[in-house]
């Protein structure tokens, strides 16, 4: 039952992402992110954030976020209302008391996040979020997630 509620929350978040960011992507030119200082992850995409709490990744991710994501999601991930407030991305997980369920929730959110960033969000032919696959490498995507985890509204 709880898993079904989690899936519904993820779907609601995806719908909110699509509905609130119709004009969000604007004309941003994605910026390259230097990830040479990070452990390289290879070609196979990870299911979970391998850089969680990695200080170097958080620093790189913060810079990458401000260069590539802030125009829509707000400086330091504080949304101005155009696109979803990414500080709330893991809120559902934070409210869980059971550590096993919390861990599963965080894992599902990592998968959702990576998919949204890589493939973007399109509905009825309208782009709500541009895809970043091919622009941001895996290391950059996970470094941004590591940064976002430091900006959470509710700590895990």
Language-model segment annotations:
Residues 1-10:
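Bacterial N-terminal signal peptides that target proteins for export
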